[in-house]
Amino acid sequence: NTEYPWELEKERFSQEELENRDKWQSIFMPSGAMIAGRVDQKHWLTFGTPESLPLLYGNYPVLMTGDNAEAVVRVGEFVPNDEIENYRSINWSSLPPGKDLNVRMSGLVWPEAAQRIANSAYLTRESVGKGQIILFSGEPNFRGSTRGTNRLWLNAVVYGAGLGTDPRVYP
């Protein structure tokens, strides 16, 4: 018997419950903590970056991706946990069986904030017309101290004009 996360209605939260949780959890957002980022290794925006990337995170917006957007880097890295046999809901997202999500790398990250930002997008790319929009949730080049996210920013600047856009030139 196959179970899918969208079929587990008993574990899903209502819209009102999600809004109440978000309002409460936003009070506890980190200020300058390093959190783990899960990287899509096959995307051109992540050329030269490892699978897991430290992200400097402050009180930044929490990005969600729609159907037509790509979440290139997500908050939290999967760690094995054999005790978990079913999908679990963490606010608006689900965790697969046998996996747990590690958000904090260093610094103060309250559990409420970790749940709020878990599985959210740090870097997104979306096609719009003949171009694209690339969004960062934080500051990828903050004082030049975060070299991993600096690489993401450089890839966006250098490759963004050609990769992911419409290459045709019409007269």
Residue ranges and their predicted role:
Residues 23, 42-44, 48-55, 66-69, ...:
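Extracellular ligand-binding/catalytic regions of CAZymes and related secreted enzymes
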Residues 71-73:
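General marker for long, soluble alpha-helical cores
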